[in-house]
Design a protein with these regions (language model features):
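Phosphate-group recognition and catalysis centered on beta-loop-alpha active-site segments
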Residues: 1-143
Length: 143
């Protein structure tokens, strides 16, 4: 099962570390995967929660265990060109990654084995999910 840190958060939301490249690398060194918010801005890639903030090199996006959330349509196109693992969230609806995983915050009986669930509910570990996405992912790793 994939354990995916939401924006580099490990033990709850830490806005000072969210989407910070160093924090993302630390999460991956811990053996976790990481969801990052990616922007295409001023002819380059950036990470940032509400706006493009941290400039990154394109190679950063191809790091193993990274899940790239395109923050707008232009970014989605650029991520596709980069061949980075990516998806584009549309109005909170369930979405599908380019690697055919489903990301959602609700559970459906269909497709659980391909589903990445956004949750902080620990009983979700008993489901046959593909992975868990959480701001508190360390709790899942310990459990």
């Amino acid at each position: 099962m994939y354990l995916i840190s939401l924006r580099g958060n490990i033990l709850g939301v830490d806005s000072k570390k969210e989407n910070k490249p160093y924090q993302i690398q630390e999460v991956i060194r811990m053996g976790l995967h990481c969801w990052v918010d990616v922007w295409w801005h001023n002819e380059g890639f950036y990470l940032g929660t509400n706006e493009p903030y941290y400039p990154i090199k394109p190679a950063f996006l191809n790091m193993f265990a990274l899940w790239c959330n395109a923050m707008n349509f232009e970014t989605l196109i650029k991520l596709k060109e980069q061949k980075a693992p990516h998806y584009f969230q549309w109005k909170g609806e369930p979405l599908m990654t380019n690697t055919l995983h489903i990301i959602t915050d609700t559970i459906s009986e269909m497709g659980l084995s391909d589903t990445l669930l956004i949750t902080d509910e620990y009983d979700s570990l008993n489901l046959p999910l593909k992975g868990i996405i959480s701001d508190n992912i360390a709790s899942f790793k310990e459990g």
